[in-house]
Amino acid sequence: MALELKIRELETTRLLLRPLELADAEQTQRIFPHWEIVKFLASVVPWPFPADGAFKHYRDRAIPAMERGDEWNWSICLKSDPGRLIGAIDLRRTHNSNRGFWLGLAWHGQGLMTEAAHAATAFWFDELGFPEMRVSKAIGNTASRRISQSNGMKLVAFEERDYVCGRLPTEVWAITADEWRSHCARSDGNSGRPTSRL
């Protein structure tokens, strides 16, 4: 597997996913700290979210993990407004939790995260070469569940996990590289398929 592969910009029909930078913390801090965004995130996210929370998270955890090759983090922007961050998505080698994301409230309900998740999943399989992706989500997180379903994933296990809102029953969804490629072939040109931005 080409785990040493550098992160690069991804493009979908409506989105640019650009590698996370420390400078993104300011925009993140403005749109991230809302209960509807954070409640189903892992309990390591502090709540109430501190005024320097995004900066410290990017400086102390996300960017070092990218430099080690343990994570691949992108800021999400609309092609129509490429300087404005609207969310983030990451890939990581953590057991049962290989992909995570959040999206600003103003952009919910438009299918944007489904598009971003498709692009990141393609990168996971086609460029990083992993054999399987697993994602965890609280049972009440129906929006995230729909994204896993639309990406062709299957429910494979149940467990309990700690979230910002407390300890909750959790679903584990998974898809193999072969299943992913079959899903993409059936989808016939899914709008989230990434294109190169070198």
Predicted regions and their residues:
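Conserved GNAT-fold acetyl-CoA-binding loop/helix
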Residues: V38-D60, W72-W74
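Soluble sensory domains of the PAS superfamily and closely related sensory modules
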Residues: A65-G69
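A generic secondary-structure signal
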Residues: D60-P64, F123
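Acyl-donor (CoA/ACP) binding surface of acyl/acetyltransferases
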Residues: M1-F40, N73-L198
